[in-house]
Curated annotation (Swiss-Prot):
GO molecular function: allene oxide synthase activity; heme binding; iron ion binding; monooxygenase activity; oxidoreductase activity, acting on paired donors, with incorporation or reduction of molecular oxygen
Species name: Solanum lycopersicum
Region (Disordered): 1-31, 43-71
This protein's name: Allene oxide synthase 1, chloroplastic
Induction line: Up-regulated by wounding, elicitors, methyl jasmonate or 12-oxophytodienoic acid (PDA).
UniProt signal peptide: none
GO CC list: chloroplast
């Protein structure tokens, strides 16, 4: 999802071993019990602790680096209207995203250059950007002392606030704006107040997913993952964060479908849907779709969240946020950020693991089952910290195909940005853009950068590379706060991704897939699920 930031609270909290009975009152109708699960942890896991000291802090003196040659940022924007339109056609159709950037790197002999980013006219009238495509220049986009993030969540255009109840939600706020800190605090509160439920509810929701896939495999010989994952993801988020089973409400099973339509009206200028090129470019990339067409769908989602988030809305009023604004933000954080992240990342991660083959599957199954067995059969955060291969696989999946592909920032003042090869002067007000898959596959940082290396982040040397995993609008070794734009749900995303692998390989020895394309992430079809044999 383009420029998506998963705005849910960071898991910097201990998970108590007890479970609140009051939070389970709405969930009896969907409980699935296969094995005991306890949401507990003996200590705060290392992956959410403070960054370790860098190697440069050792006793040996630092090596003085040669001054990089100063260059003018290469490239241009072309003629008004014509240049942005031509770049848009190249980006979507003539070249595609990766070739669009690769060809310009080759043309300019630089990973920093000027171009136009979609959608351009007549949705965005100022699509001019300076592109950053290497791991050295890219991190400036996270430095809020140097760049402003106001209204840049989706890039060179901002969807109508009619799609979010008339409010600019948290993802579009710069940390300098007063409501940013208040709303981010509210997101932290959301998860901390429901921390007991995350691991058990993930188990329940994804056990239902696996049963659905098994039934479809047995009757049809193959099973589509994406739609089933969408339903499981929405059920999990509603149950764990709001204590409600959607199927017991007026919403029923419509949540994912309603979210899909609503997200389409926000992101259509950035998507390819497979329509005839001329028609798609005219309808999807040239003019905005009217928000009124999804008003009723959005109202159904809003009603669901308003009715089932009383305690969080009470907290919002204490912080100084109206219940209405808070609810629109909760909806956005849950449906766009969190649901959208799971929708994209889970299929992408399974694509890479599926392609890696049975040997990796066996190694993961052995590691996961051994640790859980020694932990009395309980899945806990502390237990997952003892699974180095599983953790590395999650980080490698986030590195090689980050769910957040794009980042933007507007220069707050004149500055100098450095790539590996040169330095460039940037003027105040210029819009900076980074395409993250290039930064996280920088061959000057990662060996075999284009390959999926499952054990890349194991051991001391592997852990040093985590600072270059950037999917969360910040480094993996840094933490979200009210003062930055790093994804408030960074650790939540890592946790649920780990849980998916644990649940999968506790249940199955291996799986086989077919991979197709979709507007958001990979389309996965399962052709085989081999039940656990040991």
């Amino acid at each position: 999802m383009a420029s998506t930031s998963l705005s849910l609270p960071s898991l910097k909290l201990q998970f108590p071993s007890h479970t609140s009975s009051s939070s389970r009152k709405n969930s009896s109708s969907y409980r699935v019990s296969i094995r005991p699960i306890q949401a507990s942890v003996s200590e705060i896991p290392p992956y959410i602790s403070s960054p370790s000291q860098s190697p440069s802090s050792s006793s040996s003196p630092p090596v003085k680096q040669a001054k990089l040659p100063a260059q003018k940022v290469p490239g241009d924007y072309g003629l008004p209207l014509v240049g942005p339109w031509k770049d848009r056609l190249d980006y979507f159709y003539n070249q595609g995203k990766n070739e669009f950037f690769k060809s310009r790197i080759q043309k300019h002999q630089s990973t920093v250059f000027r171009t136009n980013m979609p959608p351009g006219p007549f949705i965005s009238f100022n699509p001019n950007v300076v592109v950053l495509l290497d791991g050295k220049s890219f991190p400036v986009l996270f430095d809020v002392s140097k760049v402003e993030k106001k209204d840049l969540f989706t890039g060179t255009f901002m969807p109508s606030t009619d799609l979010t109840g008339g409010y600019r939600v948290l993802s579009y706020l710069d940390p300098s704006e007063p409501n940013h800190a208040k709303l981010k605090k509210l997101m932290f509160y959301l998860l901390s107040s429901r921390r007991n439920e995350v691991i058990p509810e993930f188990h329940n929701s994804y056990s239902e997913l696996f049963e659905t896939l098994e039934n479809e495999l047995s009757t049809k010989g193959k099973a589509g993952l994406n739609a089933a994952n969408d339903q499981a993801a929405f059920n999990f988020l509603a149950r764990s964060l709001y204590g409600i089973n959607p199927q017991d409400t007026e919403l029923g099973t419509d949540g994912p479908k309603l979210i899909g339509k609503w997200v389409l009206f926000q992101l259509h200028p950035l998507l390819i849907l497979g329509l005839p090129k001329v028609l798609e470019d005219l309808v999807m990339h040239t003019f905005r779709l009217p928000p009124a067409l999804v008003k009723k769908d959005y109202q159904r989602l809003y009603n669901f969240f308003y009715e089932n988030s009383t305690s969080v809305l009470d907290e919002a009023e204490k912080i100084g946020i109206s219940r209405e604004e808070a609810c629109h933000n909760l909806l956005f954080a849950t449906c766009f950020n969190s649901f959208g992240g799971i929708k994209i990342f889970f299929p992408n991660m399974l694509k890479w693991i599926g392609r890696a083959g049975a040997k990796l599957h066996s190694q993961l199954a052995q590691e996961i089952r051994s640790v859980i067995s020694s932990n009395s059969g309980k899945v806990t955060m502390a237990a997952m910290e003892k699974m180095p291969l599983m953790k590395s696989v999650v980080y490698e999946s986030l590195r090689i195909e980050p769910p957040v592909a794009s980042q933007y920032g507007r220069a707050k003042h004149d500055m100098v940005i450095e790539s590996h090869d040169a330095s460039f002067e940037i003027k105040e007000g210029e819009l900076l853009y980074g395409y993250q898959p290039f930064a996280t596959k920088d061959p000057k940082i990662f060996d075999r950068s284009e390959e999926f290396v499952a054990d890349r982040f194991i051991g001391e040397e592997g852990e040093k590379l985590l600072k270059h995993v950037l999917w969360s609008n910040g480094s993996e070794t840094e933490n979200a706060s009210i003062n930055n734009k790093q994804c408030a749900g960074k650790d939540f995303v890592v946790l649920v991704s780990r849980l998916l692998l644990v649940e999968l390989f506790l249940r199955y020895d291996s799986f086989e897939i077919e991979v197709g394309a979709s507007p958001l992430g990979a389309a996965i079809t399962l052709t085989s699920l081999r039940r656990a044999s040991f």
